[in-house]
């Protein structure tokens, strides 16, 4: 009898509407509570360069990613090659101190025909990695091809195409982006890391110390 009475009220239009609304708010509250308890991750993305180095900060909570900072480190005014490396270390350390990232995602140098340019780029990347490891931040490298594939699905995508896709994915205003695409390349590295770590089996193993980096990359210190 009680069950029949309950069913009678349930199928009344007003009662059913109120029941659905209350159920919706209960479920919504549970999801908000779960999201509030999800730990925040801050990913620092870096696009290494011997003249201009791009960096970005990606804030991740659960499955939501948000770009909070985009910028460049301009080393062109420092003409001494060794002092420019020092400047990279100092500036990357400042970014780390300001934003307190949990992880670093950095683009690996590409292999080109100009050996001198490759050497300079490799040094710049190594110094940025050293700055992160000095602050106990795990580092993960991603090849340019892998980053482009993760963002656009095309390993031959241009910098402009990568930037445009990031604007769509992260709802960024293209008119507010830095003119130098090194910044969006850095964001691409960070977003690639976010996607890869969402599927741990596909992610590259991070470097957790300078010794770990040297062990896995002996060719970079010859």
Regions found by a protein language model. Give the residues of each.
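Short N-terminal alpha-helical targeting/association segments
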Residues: 4-6
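Phosphate- and other anionic-substrate recognition elements at nucleic-acid/protein interfaces
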Residues: 8, 15-18, 24-222
